[in-house]
């Protein structure tokens, strides 16, 4: 897993002393690390406020992820188009195309043209927009089309009648006499509306949103829409009458920007706006990171219009620090508004060419500090250092300008407790198909895979993905999938079948929505085309396309109710634990010679008398912490008497082992059982591990235990004194 250790703003002139900024970075808390595995810490440096998401989107692997050809319904197409428009807008305003290429700018413009053309397919006769032509038009979506098209008008040719027709519909059909804009047909993809999704102060926030869109289209449409100026004034007056009663920082920020566009944000209104800023750098609602990015971006735009350049830098720094490791802001509105605000900032405050900073990193594992110079020309370059040591370190920054430091530690974490599903409930089952079901001639067997899922939010989930890995040797029936995707009921949007690197197929199913009020179930046949010795389980994962944290995974297998994977993993190597559970030795007929023969077999590594002192239950394995009380035969790991040693066993072996806290056990195992580097060695309990109860001294007084205790004592003495005969 990845754990963010620290995100710091580097600004020596403002945050340092005497022009030198010192930062102490702690070590990561990796107390849940899998024993014997390594960790890696990455230290990332970058100039501010150059945006990593934009660069990744235009140049590199994230091109396909963030800048895509528009597709889907009228809402999905706008979601796809948003990133491309804002990326080009940002790079144009910051004059950074020389760092990419004009060819790539042209490619991005072609994508915008395609998105624009496809959006026109959802323009209704009244010039409004909805997800589908037969659906009632949406106020918010139509206003958002106006907003995006107004920004894109400087990039591609956009018909002013298309843009202004939407403006006219908003005014004539959706504005009340008091200036309020009403929504009668909310969008299906609620996640695309950002902070507007909150039901508190929804009417006022929507009115501010539409008002901003109208003002951004004013220069284009004022001559075509005679009532535009009057409409803007009515909405402005409505917000003025209600502004002092607003409570949400989001509502305060978006309304403030709408007011600042008309140079009306003054006096008590300005004080109200500034008072909602937490620590003078963000307009924040607890637990709503993306809403906060969006709201703070509106606030930054308002501050820029006010020319309040003393208040601007802290907001820019906070926005920049919200970039998480590996990607951008992560939502339609947060991304769009974030980069619109940052682009405007770099246009209005063009002082970044003064960026010239030296960062010195002192890692404990290195004798001399590592130095990086960050200058304007290479501000976008992501500089990184890596270390295998999980230790705190110090850093100093000197010079002019701003930068961002991110520290992330990657390590293998134990899966503790039951895996929880976030926002989705998922049930999976697989059963043998009835004899009457037709199967391909060369199929060995046919089964039916079914899964039912429900979204646990307050509204239906919009576009969601089912990621299904097939069991070994099985493939899905494409005829069934085609019926599901093209039939009269059309249960799924589309599907993709990919051959994975292993011998297992992966099926991706796209769903337009998942109900929050009832389970939605799908089933299709899967065929086994070749037999394998051990059928490994498959998995079904459901997740939200626009919020990857909302997810649930369940395993399936024809012979296992929960489909749990029976394996133990260390680094990239996994050991199959299927049918490898060791039965604790309870046979009273075991003799001294039996133990000597077994303990001296080739490949046997260690023989210990141990005491179980602690048990940790994880999701797929148990960890038994044993204290080695007597090293009857030293192993390659060189454990000393009195030293603790963790033994790991698959959860399915728990009942077979029957180990009890505080009890003693005779244990031995193969040389391949210890894993990990000293002193973090762990031991795998497999089918060749010997585990035998060793009674306590008082228990040895009982007649039934006397012979057992004598044999164990004689065994230990013989091994210590004489060793193995071979």
Swiss-Prot record:
Residues 697-722 are annotated as: Interaction with CFP/properdin. The record marks 726 as: Coordinates Mg(2+) for interaction with Complement factor B Bb fragment (CFB). There is a cross-link at residues 73-76 (Isoglutamyl cysteine thioester (Cys-Gln)). Residues 581-724 form the NTR domain. One of its GO terms (biological process) is complement activation, alternative pathway. SUPFAM superfamilies: Alpha-macroglobulin receptor domain, Terpenoid cyclases/Protein prenyltransferases, TIMP-like. This is Complement C3 alpha chain. It comes from Oryctolagus cuniculus (Rabbit). The lineage of its organism: Eukaryota, Metazoa, Chordata, Craniata, Vertebrata.
């Amino acid at each position: 897993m990845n754990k963010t250790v620290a995100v710091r703003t580097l600004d020596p002139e403002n945050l340092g002393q005497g022009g030198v900024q010192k930062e102490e970075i702690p070590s990561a808390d990796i107390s849940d690390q899998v024993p014997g595995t390594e960790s890696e810490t990455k230290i990332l440096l970058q100039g501010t406020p150059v945006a990593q998401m934009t660069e990744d989107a235009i140049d590199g692997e994230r091109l396909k992820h963030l800048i895509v050809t528009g597709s889907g319904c009228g809402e999905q197409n706008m979601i796809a188009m948003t990133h491309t428009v804002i990326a080009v807008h940002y790079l144009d305003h910051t004059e950074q195309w020389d760092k990419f290429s004009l060819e790539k700018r042209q490619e991005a413009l072609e994508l915008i043209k395609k998105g624009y053309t496809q959006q026109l397919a959802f323009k209704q006769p009244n010039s409004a927009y909805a997800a589908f032509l037969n659906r009632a038009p949406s106020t918010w979506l139509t206003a958002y089309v106006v907003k995006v098209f107004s920004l894109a008008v400087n990039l591609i040719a956009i018909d002013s009648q298309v843009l202004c027709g939407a403006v006219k519909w908003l005014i004539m059909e959706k504005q009340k006499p008091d200036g309020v804009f009403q929504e009668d047909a909310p969008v299906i993809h609620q996640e695309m509306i950002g902070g507007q999704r909150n039901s508190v102060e929804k009417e006022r926030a929507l009115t501010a949103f539409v008002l901003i869109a109208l003002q951004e289209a004013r220069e284009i449409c004022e001559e075509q829409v005679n009532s535009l100026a009057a409409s803007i004034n009515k909405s402005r007056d409505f917000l003025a009458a209600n502004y002092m009663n607003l409570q949400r920082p989001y509502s305060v920020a978006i309304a403030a920007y709408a007011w600042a566009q008309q140079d009306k944000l003054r006096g008590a209104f300005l004080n109200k706006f500034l008072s909602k800023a937490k620590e003078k750098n963000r307009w924040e609602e607890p637990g709503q990171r993306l809403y906060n990015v969006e709201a703070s971006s509106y606030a930054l735009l308002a501050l820029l219009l006010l020319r309040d350049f003393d208040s601007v830098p802290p907001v820019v720094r906070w926005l920049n620090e919200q970039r998480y490791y590996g990607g951008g802001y992560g939502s339609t509105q947060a991304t769009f508004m974030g980069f619109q605000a940052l682009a405007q900032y770099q246009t209005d405050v063009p002082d970044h060419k003064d960026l010239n900073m030296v960062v010195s990193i002192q890692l404990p594992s290195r004798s001399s500090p590592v130095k990086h110079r960050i200058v304007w020309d290479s501000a976008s370059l992501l500089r990184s250092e890596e270390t295998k040591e999980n230790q705190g370190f110090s850093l100093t920054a000197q010079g002019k300008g701003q930068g961002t430091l991110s520290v992330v530690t990657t390590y293998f974490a134990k899966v503790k407790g039951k895996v929880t599903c976030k926002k989705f409930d998922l049930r999976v089952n697989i059963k043998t198909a009835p004899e009457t079901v037709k199967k391909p001639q060369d199929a060995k067997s046919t089964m039916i895979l079914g899964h039912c899922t429900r979204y646990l939010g307050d509204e239906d989930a919009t576009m969601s993905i089912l990621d299904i890995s097939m069991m070994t040797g099985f493939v899905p029936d494409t005829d069934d999938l085609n019926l599901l995707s093209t039939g009269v009921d059309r249960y799924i949007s589309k599907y993709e079948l990919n051959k994975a690197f292993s011998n297992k197929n992966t099926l991706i199913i796209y769903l337009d929505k998942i109900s929050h009020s009832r389970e939605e179930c799908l089933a299709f046949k899967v065929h086994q085309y070749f037999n394998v010795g051990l059928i490994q389980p498959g998995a079904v994962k459901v997740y939200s396309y626009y919020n990857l944290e909302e997810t649930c995974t369940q395993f399936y297998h024809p012979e296992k109710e929960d489909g749990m994977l029976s394996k133990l993993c260390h680094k990239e190597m996994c050991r199959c634990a299927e049918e490898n559970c060791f039965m604790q030795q309870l046979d009273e007929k075991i003799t001294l010679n039996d133990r000597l023969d077994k303990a001296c077999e080739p490949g046997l590594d260690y023989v210990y008398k141990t005491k179980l002192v602690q048990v940790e239950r994880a999701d797929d394995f148990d960890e038994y912490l044993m204290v080695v009380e007597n090293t009857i035969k030293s192993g390659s790991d060189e454990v000393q008497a009195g030293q603790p040693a963790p033994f790991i066993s698959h959860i399915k072996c728990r009942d077979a082992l029957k180990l009890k806290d505080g009890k003693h056990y005779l244990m031995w195992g193969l040389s391949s059982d210890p894993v990990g580097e000293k002193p973090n060695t762990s031991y795998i309990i497999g089918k060749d591990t010997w585990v035998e109860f060793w009674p306590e001294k008082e228990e040895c007084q009982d007649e039934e235990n006397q012979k057992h205790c004598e044999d164990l004592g004689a065994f230990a003495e013989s091994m210590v004194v004489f060793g193995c005969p071979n």
